[in-house]
A protein has these predicted regions:
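A generic, well-ordered mixed alpha/beta core segment in the N-terminal half of proteins
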Residues: 1-78
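Beta-strand segments within the central parallel beta-sheet cores of soluble alpha/beta enzyme folds
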Residues: 19-21, 141-145, 185
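Hydrophobic/aromatic-lined pockets within catalytic cores
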Residues: 47-52, 102, 133, 180-182
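Soluble metallo-hydrolase cores and metallopeptidase-like ectodomains found primarily
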Residues: 59-164
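Anion-binding catalytic surfaces of enzymes that hydrolyze or transfer phosphate/sulfate esters
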Residues: 163-166, 181
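A conserved active-site cap/scaffold subdomain adjacent to cofactor or substrate pockets
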Residues: 169-170
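Alpha-helical support elements that line or immediately flank enzyme active sites
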Residues: 173-181
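Conserved small/polar residues in nucleotide/adenosyl-binding loops
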Residues: 183-189
Length: 189
């Protein structure tokens, strides 16, 4: 079902200071400010250079880490708070923070750390290689998207509503599907 999301661009991984981010562009009608400081999950498919297809889901399992778009702390955001809702967060600021730990900084020193210039990015790439078997060049053939992490849940003390990512889009698809499924009950005219 087509729902708003953050699509990961090709060749997206970059390091800014010690922070590692994924470059994105938003898809669909979103209120950009609602996508900051919430847990996001990555979903998608990566086709490796050898042709192998890998399904990726990071952030939906309770044991998974989540990723997210950072935002300014309230006491540093005076200028930001003066902007109207459409401008509080610009689309180009919706890059996803995926890590900050430099290679070789953990308890066990990493022999691969060496003189690597972008050690945090190198560490993220090492983790992706270890868990999923893909390298930086495999991002070129990847279709990855970030969506709010977590399942849909009942809303309201009386459980009378449902709250979840894409619920407004999905409820329309459900009613359309139900309408089609009942068309066999109509008489030809």
């Amino acid at each position: 079902i087509d729902s708003p999301r953050l699509d990961v661009k090709q060749n997206p991984l970059y390091q800014d200071e010690e922070l590692v981010l994924l470059d994105t562009h938003y898809y669909g009608g979103i209120k950009k400010y609602q996508w900051t400081a919430i847990p996001l999950a990555l979903h998608g498919v990566v086709v490796l250079t050898d042709g192998k297809k890998i399904n990726v889901v990071i952030g939906e399992d309770m044991d998974d880490p989540v990723v997210g778009v950072s935002d300014l702390l309230i006491h540093l955001a005076a200028e930001q708070m003066e902007k109207n809702g459409a401008k509080v967060v610009e689309g180009e600021a919706l890059d996803i923070l995926v890590g900050s730990m430099p290679m070789g900084s953990g308890k066990k020193k990493d022999e691969d750390a060496g003189e690597e210039k972008e050690k945090s990015k190198a560490y993220i790439l090492k983790l992706l290689q270890k868990k999923y078997g893909f390298k930086e060049e495999d991002f070129m053939s990847a279709e990855l998207e970030a969506v709010p992490a977590g399942p849909a849940r009942n809303m309201g003390i009386d459980n009378s509503m449902i709250m979840g990512y894409g619920q407004d889009d999905r409820v329309c698809a459900y009613t359309s599907l139900m309408a089609v499924s009942y068309t066999h009950l109509t008489l030809p005219t």
